[in-house]
Amino acid sequence: MHGKVTTIPEYILDLVPQTEIDLHCYEQLNSSEEEDEDEVDNLQKQPQQARQEEQHPCYLINTQCCRCASAVQLAVQSPTKELRALQQMLMGALELVCPLCATRR
């Protein structure tokens, strides 16, 4: 652009209106209310014991830091077999370190 007066054609090179895109969805859905009710009924019929077996209880382990002897609390959720393995490690050579000592190294 050279000159003292600016003209619009220098800025607008080609303006072409875009064709409009149809955003309407023509898909029709089947009524899924019956399916949802069936799923809810199945969950209610499922025995309470089976639901509890899916979720393992959370255990809190309270111990001391092996470096500074401050309290350390560890929350664990696992099946019984893995908890027994953790118990054996904690009774053996595995020691827990508090966050403060862990950052000090």
Swiss-Prot record:
A motif (LXCXE motif) lies at residues 23-27. Keywords: Activator, DNA-binding, Early protein, G1/S host cell cycle checkpoint dysregulation by virus, Host cytoplasm, Host nucleus, Host-virus interaction, Inhibition of host innate immune response by virus, Inhibition of host interferon signaling pathway by virus, Interferon antiviral system evasion, Metal-binding, Modulation of host cell cycle by virus, Oncogene, Transcription, Transcription regulation, Viral immunoevasion, Zinc, Zinc-finger. GO terms for cellular component: host cell cytoplasm; host cell nucleus. One of its GO terms (molecular function) is DNA binding. SUPFAM superfamilies: E7 C-terminal domain-like. GO terms for biological process: DNA-templated transcription; symbiont-mediated perturbation of host cell cycle G1/S transition checkpoint; symbiont-mediated suppression of host innate immune response; symbiont-mediated suppression of host type I interferon-mediated signaling pathway. Highly phosphorylated. It holds the Pfam family E7. It is found in: Host cytoplasm; Host nucleus. Coiled coil: none annotated. InterPro entries: Papilloma_E7 (IPR000148). Residues 32-41 have a biased composition (Acidic residues). Plays a role in viral genome replication by driving entry of quiescent cells into the cell cycle. Stimulation of progression from G1 to S phase allows the virus to efficiently use the cellular DNA replicating machinery to achieve viral genome replication. E7 protein has both transforming and trans-activating activities. Induces the disassembly of the E2F1 transcription factor from RB1, with subsequent transcriptional activation of E2F1-regulated S-phase genes. Interferes with host histone deacetylation mediated by HDAC1 and HDAC2, leading to transcription activation. The E7 terminal domain is an intrinsically disordered domain, whose flexibility and conformational transitions confer target adaptability to the oncoprotein. It allows adaptation to a variety of protein targets and exposes the PEST degradation sequence that regulates its turnover in the cell. This is Protein E7. It comes from Human papillomavirus 30. The gene is E7.
